[in-house]
Amino acid sequence: MFQQIGAVQAKSGTDEPAHPCEKFPPERKCEAVFWKPLPRHEAREILLAARKYELAMKQPGKRTGPLGHVALEVLDYLTNLVDFGNGRLDPSISTIMEKIGRAESCMSALYPNRQRGRRPAGAADKQRLPLEPAGARPRALLGKYVRKAAPLPDDAAQARQERHDTIKAHMDSLSPADRLRETVEDRTRAEQLAGYVERAAQNRPSGPRKAARRRQQSRCSFTTPNRPRRTLPSSHPQKFGGTKGRKAFE
Protein backbone atom coordinates (compact mmCIF):
# COMPACT_ATOMS: atom_id res chain seq x y z
CA MET A 1 0.00 0.00 0.00
CA PHE A 2 2.81 2.42 0.91
CA GLN A 3 4.53 1.64 -2.39
CA GLN A 4 1.40 2.60 -4.31
CA ILE A 5 1.08 5.86 -2.36
CA GLY A 6 4.72 6.68 -3.09
CA ALA A 7 4.25 6.00 -6.79
CA VAL A 8 1.25 8.32 -6.90
CA GLN A 9 3.16 11.08 -5.10
CA ALA A 10 6.10 10.70 -7.47
CA LYS A 11 3.84 11.09 -10.52
CA SER A 12 2.07 14.11 -9.06
CA GLY A 13 5.29 16.08 -8.78
CA THR A 14 5.55 16.93 -12.46
CA ASP A 15 6.14 20.48 -13.69
CA GLU A 16 3.39 20.38 -16.33
CA PRO A 17 0.90 23.24 -15.95
CA ALA A 18 -2.66 22.32 -15.10
CA HIS A 19 -5.21 22.91 -17.86
CA PRO A 20 -8.75 23.82 -16.81
CA CYS A 21 -11.51 21.60 -18.09
CA GLU A 22 -13.86 23.79 -20.11
CA LYS A 23 -17.26 22.30 -20.79
CA PHE A 24 -18.35 25.01 -23.22
CA PRO A 25 -16.31 26.89 -25.83
CA PRO A 26 -15.32 30.47 -25.03
CA GLU A 27 -17.74 31.78 -27.66
CA ARG A 28 -20.72 30.69 -25.59
CA LYS A 29 -19.45 32.58 -22.54
CA CYS A 30 -19.00 35.82 -24.45
CA GLU A 31 -21.86 38.30 -24.23
CA ALA A 32 -21.16 39.46 -27.77
CA VAL A 33 -23.09 36.42 -28.97
CA PHE A 34 -26.17 37.62 -27.10
CA TRP A 35 -26.21 41.22 -28.33
CA LYS A 36 -27.18 42.13 -31.86
CA PRO A 37 -27.06 45.54 -33.55
CA LEU A 38 -30.35 47.42 -33.39
CA PRO A 39 -31.02 50.12 -35.99
CA ARG A 40 -32.52 53.33 -34.73
CA HIS A 41 -35.68 53.04 -36.84
CA GLU A 42 -36.36 49.57 -35.42
CA ALA A 43 -36.15 50.96 -31.89
CA ARG A 44 -38.75 53.58 -32.81
CA GLU A 45 -40.94 50.90 -34.39
CA ILE A 46 -40.75 48.83 -31.19
CA LEU A 47 -41.95 51.72 -29.06
CA LEU A 48 -44.69 52.65 -31.55
CA ALA A 49 -45.85 49.02 -31.74
CA ALA A 50 -46.08 48.84 -27.94
CA ARG A 51 -48.20 52.00 -27.80
CA LYS A 52 -50.55 50.82 -30.53
CA TYR A 53 -50.77 47.41 -28.89
CA GLU A 54 -51.70 49.07 -25.59
CA LEU A 55 -54.53 51.02 -27.24
CA ALA A 56 -55.80 48.13 -29.35
CA MET A 57 -55.92 45.58 -26.51
CA LYS A 58 -57.38 47.89 -23.87
CA GLN A 59 -60.67 46.56 -22.50
CA PRO A 60 -63.69 48.89 -22.11
CA GLY A 61 -63.87 50.36 -18.63
CA LYS A 62 -60.20 49.69 -17.83
CA ARG A 63 -57.69 52.43 -17.12
CA THR A 64 -54.82 50.77 -18.91
CA GLY A 65 -54.20 47.97 -21.34
CA PRO A 66 -52.16 44.80 -20.93
CA LEU A 67 -48.86 46.72 -20.69
CA GLY A 68 -49.69 49.81 -18.66
CA HIS A 69 -48.36 53.37 -18.84
CA VAL A 70 -45.42 52.59 -16.53
CA ALA A 71 -44.29 49.78 -18.83
CA LEU A 72 -44.41 52.20 -21.76
CA GLU A 73 -42.24 54.63 -19.80
CA VAL A 74 -39.73 51.88 -19.09
CA LEU A 75 -39.71 50.84 -22.74
CA ASP A 76 -39.26 54.45 -23.83
CA TYR A 77 -36.24 54.78 -21.55
CA LEU A 78 -34.76 51.50 -22.79
CA THR A 79 -35.09 52.52 -26.44
CA ASN A 80 -33.16 55.71 -25.66
CA LEU A 81 -30.53 53.88 -23.61
CA VAL A 82 -29.73 51.04 -26.01
CA ASP A 83 -26.46 51.12 -27.96
CA PHE A 84 -27.57 50.98 -31.59
CA GLY A 85 -24.14 49.88 -32.79
CA ASN A 86 -23.93 46.58 -30.93
CA GLY A 87 -27.37 46.38 -29.30
CA ARG A 88 -26.01 46.25 -25.76
CA LEU A 89 -28.58 47.04 -23.08
CA ASP A 90 -28.00 46.03 -19.45
CA PRO A 91 -29.23 48.73 -17.04
CA SER A 92 -29.82 47.99 -13.38
CA ILE A 93 -33.22 48.23 -11.73
CA SER A 94 -32.08 51.14 -9.56
CA THR A 95 -30.96 53.07 -12.65
CA ILE A 96 -34.32 52.59 -14.33
CA MET A 97 -36.14 53.63 -11.15
CA GLU A 98 -34.03 56.78 -10.85
CA LYS A 99 -34.35 57.85 -14.48
CA ILE A 100 -38.10 57.40 -14.89
CA GLY A 101 -38.97 58.50 -11.35
CA ARG A 102 -40.71 55.28 -10.34
CA ALA A 103 -40.22 52.98 -7.37
CA GLU A 104 -41.91 49.60 -6.97
CA SER A 105 -44.09 50.16 -10.02
CA CYS A 106 -40.95 49.92 -12.14
CA MET A 107 -40.46 46.31 -11.05
CA SER A 108 -44.07 45.39 -11.80
CA ALA A 109 -43.88 47.13 -15.19
CA LEU A 110 -41.04 44.90 -16.36
CA TYR A 111 -43.15 41.77 -15.96
CA PRO A 112 -45.68 42.55 -18.76
CA ASN A 113 -42.80 43.41 -21.08
CA ARG A 114 -41.20 40.04 -20.39
CA GLN A 115 -44.46 38.15 -20.76
CA ARG A 116 -45.34 39.73 -24.11
CA GLY A 117 -41.83 39.81 -25.52
CA ARG A 118 -39.42 37.05 -26.45
CA ARG A 119 -36.80 36.74 -23.74
CA PRO A 120 -33.80 34.41 -24.17
CA ALA A 121 -33.12 31.91 -21.43
CA GLY A 122 -30.19 32.51 -19.12
CA ALA A 123 -30.36 36.32 -19.33
CA ALA A 124 -31.88 37.31 -16.01
CA ASP A 125 -30.32 40.77 -15.79
CA LYS A 126 -30.35 41.77 -19.45
CA GLN A 127 -33.03 43.33 -21.63
CA ARG A 128 -33.69 42.91 -25.33
CA LEU A 129 -35.89 44.89 -27.65
CA PRO A 130 -37.46 42.52 -30.19
CA LEU A 131 -40.41 43.61 -32.29
CA GLU A 132 -42.49 40.61 -31.18
CA PRO A 133 -44.34 41.58 -28.00
CA ALA A 134 -47.33 39.41 -28.88
CA GLY A 135 -46.50 37.60 -32.07
CA ALA A 136 -47.25 39.33 -35.37
CA ARG A 137 -50.11 41.47 -34.01
CA PRO A 138 -48.03 44.55 -33.07
CA ARG A 139 -46.35 44.51 -36.47
CA ALA A 140 -49.79 44.34 -38.09
CA LEU A 141 -50.96 47.26 -35.94
CA LEU A 142 -48.09 49.40 -37.16
CA GLY A 143 -49.28 49.17 -40.73
CA LYS A 144 -47.52 51.71 -42.93
CA TYR A 145 -45.07 52.71 -40.19
CA VAL A 146 -43.10 49.50 -40.55
CA ARG A 147 -40.43 49.47 -43.22
CA LYS A 148 -41.14 46.77 -45.72
CA ALA A 149 -38.34 44.83 -47.31
CA ALA A 150 -37.56 45.65 -50.92
CA PRO A 151 -38.75 43.06 -53.44
CA LEU A 152 -36.22 40.65 -54.84
CA PRO A 153 -34.77 41.48 -58.26
CA ASP A 154 -35.90 39.35 -61.16
CA ASP A 155 -32.48 37.79 -61.65
CA ALA A 156 -32.26 36.84 -57.96
CA ALA A 157 -35.72 35.24 -58.02
CA GLN A 158 -34.86 33.37 -61.22
CA ALA A 159 -31.56 32.16 -59.76
CA ARG A 160 -33.34 30.94 -56.64
CA GLN A 161 -35.94 29.08 -58.71
CA GLU A 162 -33.26 27.48 -60.89
CA ARG A 163 -31.35 26.38 -57.82
CA HIS A 164 -34.53 24.89 -56.35
CA ASP A 165 -35.26 23.00 -59.59
CA THR A 166 -31.69 21.71 -59.76
CA ILE A 167 -31.80 20.43 -56.20
CA LYS A 168 -35.20 18.81 -56.80
CA ALA A 169 -33.99 17.07 -59.95
CA HIS A 170 -30.90 15.84 -58.12
CA MET A 171 -32.96 14.48 -55.22
CA ASP A 172 -35.38 12.75 -57.61
CA SER A 173 -32.49 11.00 -59.35
CA LEU A 174 -31.21 9.47 -56.10
CA SER A 175 -32.29 6.18 -54.64
CA PRO A 176 -34.21 6.17 -51.34
CA ALA A 177 -31.07 5.20 -49.41
CA ASP A 178 -28.94 7.90 -51.04
CA ARG A 179 -31.70 10.44 -50.46
CA LEU A 180 -31.56 9.68 -46.75
CA ARG A 181 -27.79 10.14 -46.77
CA GLU A 182 -28.23 13.54 -48.37
CA THR A 183 -31.05 14.87 -46.19
CA VAL A 184 -30.31 13.53 -42.68
CA GLU A 185 -27.70 15.69 -40.96
CA ASP A 186 -26.54 13.06 -38.47
CA ARG A 187 -24.21 10.86 -40.50
CA THR A 188 -24.47 7.86 -38.18
CA ARG A 189 -28.25 8.01 -38.18
CA ALA A 190 -28.30 8.50 -41.95
CA GLU A 191 -26.20 5.38 -42.52
CA GLN A 192 -28.45 3.35 -40.23
CA LEU A 193 -31.61 4.43 -42.02
CA ALA A 194 -30.03 3.90 -45.43
CA GLY A 195 -28.97 0.39 -44.38
CA TYR A 196 -32.51 -0.43 -43.30
CA VAL A 197 -33.90 0.75 -46.64
CA GLU A 198 -31.32 -1.20 -48.65
CA ARG A 199 -31.92 -4.43 -46.72
CA ALA A 200 -35.67 -4.04 -47.11
CA ALA A 201 -35.25 -3.57 -50.86
CA GLN A 202 -33.08 -6.71 -51.10
CA ASN A 203 -35.56 -8.86 -49.16
CA ARG A 204 -38.48 -7.66 -51.25
CA PRO A 205 -39.40 -10.31 -53.93
CA SER A 206 -39.05 -9.17 -57.52
CA GLY A 207 -38.95 -10.75 -60.98
CA PRO A 208 -39.29 -14.59 -61.11
CA ARG A 209 -39.65 -14.89 -57.33
CA LYS A 210 -42.54 -12.45 -57.37
CA ALA A 211 -44.27 -14.31 -60.22
CA ALA A 212 -43.83 -17.65 -58.44
CA ARG A 213 -45.35 -16.24 -55.28
CA ARG A 214 -48.33 -14.97 -57.25
CA ARG A 215 -48.89 -18.42 -58.81
CA GLN A 216 -48.71 -20.04 -55.41
CA GLN A 217 -51.27 -17.61 -54.04
CA SER A 218 -53.58 -18.29 -56.97
CA ARG A 219 -53.38 -22.05 -56.33
CA CYS A 220 -54.27 -21.62 -52.70
CA SER A 221 -57.35 -19.57 -53.50
CA PHE A 222 -60.75 -21.09 -52.83
CA THR A 223 -62.49 -19.79 -55.97
CA THR A 224 -63.89 -22.54 -58.22
CA PRO A 225 -63.67 -22.16 -62.00
CA ASN A 226 -66.84 -21.78 -64.07
CA ARG A 227 -68.01 -25.17 -65.29
CA PRO A 228 -70.04 -25.70 -68.51
CA ARG A 229 -73.77 -26.30 -68.19
CA ARG A 230 -74.73 -29.94 -67.88
CA THR A 231 -77.13 -31.19 -70.53
CA LEU A 232 -79.39 -34.23 -70.33
CA PRO A 233 -78.51 -37.06 -72.73
CA SER A 234 -81.25 -37.75 -75.29
CA SER A 235 -80.92 -41.58 -75.03
CA HIS A 236 -82.71 -41.82 -71.65
CA PRO A 237 -85.84 -39.64 -71.79
CA GLN A 238 -87.88 -42.05 -69.63
CA LYS A 239 -85.99 -41.21 -66.44
CA PHE A 240 -87.43 -37.70 -66.43
CA GLY A 241 -90.97 -38.40 -67.53
CA GLY A 242 -90.46 -38.86 -71.22
CA THR A 243 -89.82 -36.17 -73.74
CA LYS A 244 -91.98 -33.65 -71.92
CA GLY A 245 -89.99 -34.05 -68.72
CA ARG A 246 -86.72 -33.73 -70.61
CA LYS A 247 -87.84 -30.50 -72.21
CA ALA A 248 -88.95 -29.14 -68.83
CA PHE A 249 -85.55 -29.98 -67.34
CA GLU A 250 -83.74 -28.22 -70.15
Swiss-Prot record:
Annotated stretches, region: Disordered: 1-23, 168-250
Compositional bias per record (Basic and acidic residues), positions renumbered to this chain: 13-23, 178-190
Tree of life domain: Bacteria
Biased composition (Polar residues): 218-237
Keyword vocabulary terms for this entry: DNA replication, Plasmid
Biological process according to GO: DNA replication
Known role: Required for replication. It likely regulates pTAR copy number.
Protein name from the UniProt record: Replicating protein
Source organism of this protein record: Rhizobium radiobacter (Agrobacterium tumefaciens)
Biological classification of the source: Bacteria, Pseudomonadati, Pseudomonadota, Alphaproteobacteria, Hyphomicrobiales
